[in-house]
Design a protein with these regions (language model features):
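C-terminal membrane-associated helical module and adjoining short loops/tails
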Residues: 2, 7, 12, 17-36, ...
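Topogenic membrane-insertion module of multi-pass membrane proteins
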Residues: 2-3, 7, 15-110, 117-127, ...
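Alpha-helical transmembrane segments of multipass membrane proteins
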Residues: 50, 88, 92, 134, ...
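Structural signal for membrane-spanning alpha-helices in multi-pass inner-membrane proteins
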Residues: 51-58, 134-139, 156-160, 181-186, ...
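Short helix-capping/hinge motifs at transmembrane helix termini and TM-loop junctions
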Residues: 58-62, 141-142, 163, 213, ...
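Helix N-cap and loop-to-helix transition residues
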Residues: 73-74, 119, 142, 220, ...
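Multi-pass membrane catalytic core of lipid/isoprenoid biosynthesis enzymes
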Residues: 80-85, 101-156, 160, 172-175, ...
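Short, amphipathic alpha-helical segments
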Residues: 148-152, 166, 174, 189, ...
Length: 349
């Protein structure tokens, strides 16, 4: 979830794990670890899975035979989708740290910039290189993919520079950025329900993390209502556009069973249960926020797997399910190595 990369959830001091690894690492290994922490790539698995889902669904539907994603070799499509997702994810994370450097010196001194493990100029190079890589990968999917990537980059810049200080705008911006990123491989995709779920998931996670972490300004009743109105507007636009563009062929992908929506609903319910358990067992609200952000980023891969199963693409669903397992393992390992969590938008938004 690209939008989530903008969410900066500081790791609580009581749960930072072993930080000695960052002290003894030097040379290439130390630079790699610092880059991983700066870009929060351990949480990019969900964002990659989002784009891979659209690649798989588009290639299984002959209605998109005119699109580059349909004609390109599968390895090329998957590689370009992954680069686009990782690039935008890393761009948002690096941009967040650059613009929040002063704040992090006081409240998150373990981050790479305030800790002095990377200079501001180097972080800027990482951000720009990540953005250029994502744009280069997106253009492979056509002009529409490139335009969407530029829009997402603009939304990430808007969020980090201003919108995150206005909850009514920032929370929705995270969701919209996540949905837009997902559509990069096929901007003509009419089955927009997965993108809507991604937008809703990212917005909900961003809201919960914002509240648990005690961010300021607080979400007032007025801000909550405005954010809700924004979510409704973009939901109607996203789903309505998909329905309007597929009046003859149908909204649902061919071959989908009548019970297809049940699987994503089950995945959503399971995530709700996981969130409740993690929040209740957390030692502090900030630890709870970190866990919600981490599991929220991972869960996108599970959603993608469930959508593939629902649409009859069982082997692809198994593959993305395994990818989600790898993502969880990677996040767990890197969490211990880095001693702090990385978090987007939380493209996660």
């Amino acid at each position: 979830m690209i939008g989530q990369v903008a969410l900066d959830v500081p790791r609580p001091a009581e749960d930072r794990g072993w930080n000695g690894s960052l002290v003894i690492m030097s040379g290439a290994a130390g630079r790699i670890v610092t880059a991983l922490e700066l870009t929060r790539l351990s949480m990019a698995f969900g964002a990659i899975a989002d784009l891979w889902l659209i690649v798989m669904l588009a290639r299984a539907d002959p209605r998109y035979a005119f699109m580059p994603v349909y004609a390109l070799p599968l390895p090329v499509s998957l590689a370009c989708a992954a680069i686009a997702a990782i690039g935008l994810f890393a761009f948002g994370a690096s941009l967040n740290d650059l613009l929040d450097a002063r704040h992090d010196r006081a409240f998150a001194p373990q981050r790479p910039l305030p800790a002095g493990r990377i200079r501001g100029g180097q972080a800027l190079v990482v951000a720009l290189a990540s953005l250029l890589a994502s744009l280069a990968a997106s253009v492979i999917f056509g002009t529409g993919g490139l335009i969407l990537a530029v829009i997402v980059a603009g939304l990430l810049l808007l969020y980090n520079a201003a919108a995150k200080h206005v909850p009514a705008a920032g929370l929705v911006t995270i969701g919209v950025a996540s949905a837009a990123t997902m559509m990069i491989p096929n901007d003509q995709f009419t089955f927009t329900l997965p993108a809507w779920l991604t937008m809703t998931h990212a917005t909900a996670i961003a809201t919960l993390v914002y509240v648990l972490d005690g961010k300021r300004p607080q979400i007032t009743a007025r801000a909550g209502v405005l954010a809700g109105i924004g979510w409704i507007f973009w939901s109607m636009l996203l789903i309505g556009a998909g329905v309007a563009r597929s009046p003859e062929t149908g909204y649902w992908p061919a071959g989908s069973a009548w019970w297809a929506p049940v699987l994503p609903v089950v995945a959503t319910a399971l995530f709700g249960i996981v969130v409740v358990r993690k929040v209740r067992r957390a030692k502090s609200p900030s630890i709870a926020a970190e866990k919600v952000a981490r599991y929220g980023a991972l869960w996108q891969a599970l959603y993608a797997a469930m959508w593939l199963f629902a649409c009859g693409l069982h082997m692809a669903g198994i593959a993305l399910g395994a990818f989600a397992g790898v993502g969880f393992l990677a996040m767990t390992v890197l969490k211990e190595i880095l001693g702090s969590s990385g978090r987007p938008l939380e493209w996660r938004g």
